[in-house]
């Protein structure tokens, strides 16, 4: 399909919001049989990185879009900007914790985004926040993201990749790489870990975030630890409900604890001052990730051929219209184009060079640095 014709079919799907979980199409009973049938021939411990799903089990967006939505898709308060607006270091760390929690989004059980193709990009703006993401490596699937806040002089970079493993009763997705936020007005750097994703089939189907997240700022000697509680039977028996979060803020050097963090990331999260006993709500999910809107096209001519919403537009349109044969055929076209590009590069001896990031492999780890200091305004915007 010619590029100009593809532009006419640009599909911008709505991000998954809290209220969408009540949609009957997303209930576990509607997908569990299809999923189990897919894994009949898959052995426990198998790497599922390149496992291909039928369109019926795909969300109408790529993995790269999902990463971007964690940063640019929100309603209400600009939580990223708040990280730099606070006067005291402890208040800034609390704001970074709040923003980090806000990047956690509901996961649709049994449904998965498309595997982003090499060179795919996603460029969206929301107010003063500009985000560019790029698929910089295909095997393993390494994604890089750069976001800048024009007004508050904030720089966010992600370099991450995931390794899904089939464990018999569940799929365990370990998200590797790092996230770094720089508050340039305060000369502070915050390094963050990432939680794991669990897709459980038995005994009760469900999808949830789990594991430990650390947030550390060397310049202020402050650190936070967040524990996302797994939705296992044992944890529920202990009284830890689905999507609960517990943690603490403390001084790195002394270990002196300053705050307790507790609550549910899909509802409210509280912070308790250890010294004064004062309680405050630091995050309200309903105010931030309810009623999310898709981007709109501000400048069609600036939408590039590598833009996620263009690469997958035919597939997404087929899924949204439940035209599964059309979606399947369109998905094959995208995959064949990817293979043809690889074959052409191998024949000519060319190496793939990302457009927006410098990528370095260090042993088994990857590091991605943006080539430009700031992200320009995007042709796709949140209004």
From Swiss-Prot:
Domain of life, source organism: Eukaryota
Keywords: Lipid transport, Lipid-binding, Transport
Coiled coil (UniProt feature): none
PANTHER family assigned to the protein according to its UniProt record, in alphabetical order: OXYSTEROL-BINDING PROTEIN, OXYSTEROL-BINDING PROTEIN-RELATED
One GO-annotated biological process of the protein: lipid transport
InterPro entries: OSBP_sf, Oxysterol-bd
Signal peptide: none
Family, similarity comment: Belongs to the OSBP family.
SUPFAM superfamilies: Oxysterol-binding protein-like
Protein name, as recorded: Oxysterol-binding protein-related protein 4B
GO molecular function: lipid binding
Role played: May be involved in the transport of sterols.
Tissues in which the protein is found: Expressed in stems and flowers.
Entries under Pfam families matching the protein: Oxysterol_BP (PF01237)
């Amino acid at each position: 399909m010619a590029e100009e014709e593809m532009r006419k079919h640009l599909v911008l799907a709505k991000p998954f919001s809290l209220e969408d979980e009540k949609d009957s199409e997303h209930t576990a009973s509607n997908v569990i049989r299809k999923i189990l049938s897919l894994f009949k021939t898959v052995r426990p411990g198998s790497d599922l990185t390149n496992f291909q799903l039928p369109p019926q089990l795909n969300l109408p967006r790529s993995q790269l879009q999902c990463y971007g939505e964690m940063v640019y898709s929100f309603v209400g308060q600009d939580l990223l900007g708040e990280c730099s607006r606070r006067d005291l270091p402890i208040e800034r760390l609390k704001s970074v914790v709040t923003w980090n929690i806000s990047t956690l989004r509901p996961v649709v059980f049994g449904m998965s985004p498309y595997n982003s193709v090499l060179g795919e990009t996603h460029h969206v703006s929301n107010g003063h926040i500009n985000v560019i993401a790029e698929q910089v490596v295909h095997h393993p699937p390494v994604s890089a993201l750069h976001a800048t806040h024009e007004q508050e002089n904030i720089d966010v970079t992600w370099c991450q990749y995931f390794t899904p493993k089939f464990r018999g009763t569940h799929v365990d997705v370990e998200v590797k790489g790092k996230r770094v936020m720089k508050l340039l007005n305060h000369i502070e750097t915050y390094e963050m870990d990432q939680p794991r994703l669990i897709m459980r089939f038995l005994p009760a189907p469900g999808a949830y975030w789990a594991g430990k997240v650390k947030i550390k700022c060397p310049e202020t000697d402050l650190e936070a630890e967040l524990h996302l509680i797994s939705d296992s039977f044992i944890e529920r028996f202990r009284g830890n409900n689905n999507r609960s979060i517990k943690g603490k803020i403390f001084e790195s050097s002394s270990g002196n604890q300053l705050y307790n963090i507790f609550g549910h990331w899909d509802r409210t999260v509280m912070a308790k001052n250890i010294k004064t006993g004062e309680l405050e709500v630091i995050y309200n999910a309903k105010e931030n990730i309810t009623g999310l809107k898709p981007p709109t096209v501000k400048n069609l001519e600036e939408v590039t051929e590598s833009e996620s919403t263009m690469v997958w537009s035919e597939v997404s349109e087929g899924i949204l219209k439940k035209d599964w044969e059309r979606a399947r055929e369109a998905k094959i076209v995208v995959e064949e184009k990817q293979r043809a590009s690889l074959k052409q590069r191998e024949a000519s001896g060319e190496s793939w060079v990302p457009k927006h990031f410098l990528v370095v492999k260090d042993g088994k780890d990857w590091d991605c640095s943006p080539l430009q200091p700031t992200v320009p305004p995007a042709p796709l915007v949140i209004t």
